[in-house]
């Protein structure tokens, strides 16, 4: 399973997503879109918006901290 979290350092909801994944023992790639414009463009292409967090779980894109959607995507 490949998990990416597009976030910024100052976003409280981004920290909630990352804490949630860490608590579940899920490894993920943390991508700081504030420091990486190329990654920010990639995030916008996937999600259609500029807001963070955006979580990509094996191609399922979840905008915001949607616990149920994240759990469903993790379950496959």
What residues fall within each predicted segment?
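Local sequence-structure signature of Cys/Sec-based thiol-disulfide redox active-site neighborhoods
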Residues: 1-24
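Short hydrophobic/aromatic patches at helix-to-coil boundaries
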Residues: 72-76
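Conserved beta-strand scaffold positions in the cores of enzyme catalytic domains, especially
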Residues: 25-30, 61
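A short, hydrophobic beta-strand/beta-hairpin element that forms part of a small beta-sheet core
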Residues: 53-61
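ATP/adenylate-binding site constellation spanning eukaryotic-like Ser/Thr protein kinases
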Residues: 8, 36, 67
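Thiol-based oxidoreductase modules, predominantly thioredoxin-like and allied folds used
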Residues: 28-39
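Thiol/disulfide oxidoreductase modules built on the thioredoxin-like
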Residues: 42-51, 63
């Amino acid at each position: 399973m490949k998990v990416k979290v597009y976030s910024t350092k100052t976003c409280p909801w981004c920290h909630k997503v990352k804490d949630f994944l860490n608590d579940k023992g899920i490894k993920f790639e943390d991508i700081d879109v504030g420091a990486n414009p190329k990654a920010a463009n990639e995030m916008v292409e996937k999600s259609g918006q500029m807001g963070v967090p955006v979580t990509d779980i094996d191609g399922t894109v979840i905008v915001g901290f949607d616990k149920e959607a994240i759990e469903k995507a993790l379950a496959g």
